[in-house]
């Protein structure tokens, strides 16, 4: 039988990994699509994408409840017609992590694409490549470090997410409780042993994430200097 502490660690990793993969795919597609649209609609989309950077976690959590709760705009439909309840599930943790990491990943990919020389794309089009082929064979390989850096930042942010997740997913041990929530619960109940255990775990993971990010940044900087 898996111990509760191990379940908490595995759940936190699962939420962080899945949300990071999802936000990577969505961010690449969003940047690619919005890059071809210079209308006001693009500005509105980018404002919505970056909104979570400028509002508190509790406000974000409440907004998500209004949307995904059983009486929410989307949640009511899911519950009525498909008997799906997002709130107080581990999927709520993934959705919250996705929302809070989307600005990090989106802006990282956007910066990468903005730095590319348009000559590459023109050469691809002259060679008969479709826009999707240009994205897959030219754009993505050239911005892979931006994507990796964004993934590292997104994973780290998802690992430490607390406020909005607490409101949408709840703090249910063995079901939705993540490492950050476990530290909060343990400290509230005076269980310093458990709080210190999870503190060490999250710090170790954070240091590993920072080492990977610094390595990617150093490699990118070295490549720029070589040019």
What residue ranges belong to the model's regions?
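Membrane-cytosol interface at the C-terminal ends of specific transmembrane alpha-helices
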Residues: 86-125, 150-151, 211, 215
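Transmembrane alpha-helices
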Residues: 21, 106-109, 117, 132-164
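Membrane-interfacial helix termini and adjacent extracytoplasmic/periplasmic loops
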Residues: 61-98, 168-172
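Transmembrane-helix boundary motif in ABC transporter permease subunits
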Residues: 18-49, 64, 112-118, 139, ...
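Periplasmic/extracellular loop-to-transmembrane helix junction in inner-membrane transport proteins
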Residues: 1-21, 33-39, 188-192
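Interhelical loop and adjacent transmembrane-helix boundary motif
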Residues: 1-7, 168-211
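C-terminal transmembrane helix and the adjacent membrane-cytosol boundary/short C-terminal tail
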Residues: 41, 110-125, 138, 192-227
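Membrane-helix interface segments
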Residues: 37-45, 73-74, 89, 119, ...
């Amino acid at each position: 039988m898996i111990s509760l502490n191990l379940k908490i660690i595995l759940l936190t990793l699962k939420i962080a990994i899945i949300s990071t993969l999802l936000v990577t795919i969505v961010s690449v597609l969003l940047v690619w699509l919005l890059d071809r649209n210079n209308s006001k609609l693009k500005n509105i989309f980018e404002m919505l994408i970056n909104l979570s950077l400028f509002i508190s976690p509790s406000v974000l959590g409440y907004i998500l409840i209004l949307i995904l709760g059983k009486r929410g705009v989307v949640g009511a439909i899911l519950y009525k017609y498909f008997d799906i309840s997002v709130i107080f599930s581990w999927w709520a943790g993934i959705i919250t992590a996705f929302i809070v990491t989307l600005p990090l990943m989106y802006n990282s990919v956007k910066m990468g694409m903005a730095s590319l020389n348009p000559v590459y794309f023109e050469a691809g089009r002259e060679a008969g490549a479709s826009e999707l082929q240009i994205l897959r064979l030219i754009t993505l390989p050239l911005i892979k470090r931006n994507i990796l850096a964004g993934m590292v930042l997104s994973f780290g942010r998802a690992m430490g997410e607390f406020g909005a997740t607490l409101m949408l997913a709840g703090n249910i041990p063995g079901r939705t409780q993540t490492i950050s929530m476990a530290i909060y619960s343990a400290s509230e109940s005076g269980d310093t042993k458990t709080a210190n255990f999870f503190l060490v775990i999250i710090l170790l993971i954070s240091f590993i994430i920072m080492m990977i990010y610094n390595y990617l940044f150093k490699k990118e900087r070295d490549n720029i200097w070589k040019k």
